[in-house]
């Protein structure tokens, strides 16, 4: 997700595979701008060099950031438990990340079956928001 809601909810280490709307960069010189700069711009946001300022998000046919992929894979590979939720597991490469999990506890929360055959210790067939909102920590 590109909206930063995981961070607002308190998540400390988020691998934003598809980027973030809170970071924006010039397509010409690479200079970064924050979301406020884009909001205050009239029309298409422009850099001081004249280039177009684009949200740092992955659009169709654009590649994912290799460093972000590496971080996500390493985190999954070293995890003891993995919770998968709210995904069809259809879109790659993210759907394939589960193959790196070597831990002993796997849980899936999803309102429908996933496209990938997963041998989970726990499967809950319901919307993830409904289930997670019931958890008291």
Give the positions of each predicted feature.
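Conserved catalytic alpha/beta core of Sir2/sirtuin-type deacylases, generalized to analogous enzyme cores
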Residues: 2-137
């Amino acid at each position: 997700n590109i909206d930063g809601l995981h961070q607002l909810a308190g998540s400390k280490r988020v691998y934003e595979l598809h980027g973030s709307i809170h970071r924006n960069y010039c397509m010409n010189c690479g200079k970064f701008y924050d979301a406020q700069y884009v909001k205050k711009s009239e029309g298409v946001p422009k850099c001081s060099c004249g280039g177009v300022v684009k949200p740092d998000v992955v659009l169709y046919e654009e590649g994912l950031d290799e460093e972000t992929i590496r971080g996500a894979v390493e985190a999954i590979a070293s995890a003891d438990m993995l919770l998968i939720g709210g995904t069809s597991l259809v879109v790659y490469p993210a759907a394939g990340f589960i193959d790196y999990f070597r831990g002993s506890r796997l849980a899936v929360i999803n309102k429908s079956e996933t496209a990938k055959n997963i041998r989970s210790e726990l499967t809950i067939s319901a919307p993830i928001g409904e289930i997670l909102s019931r958890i008291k920590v």
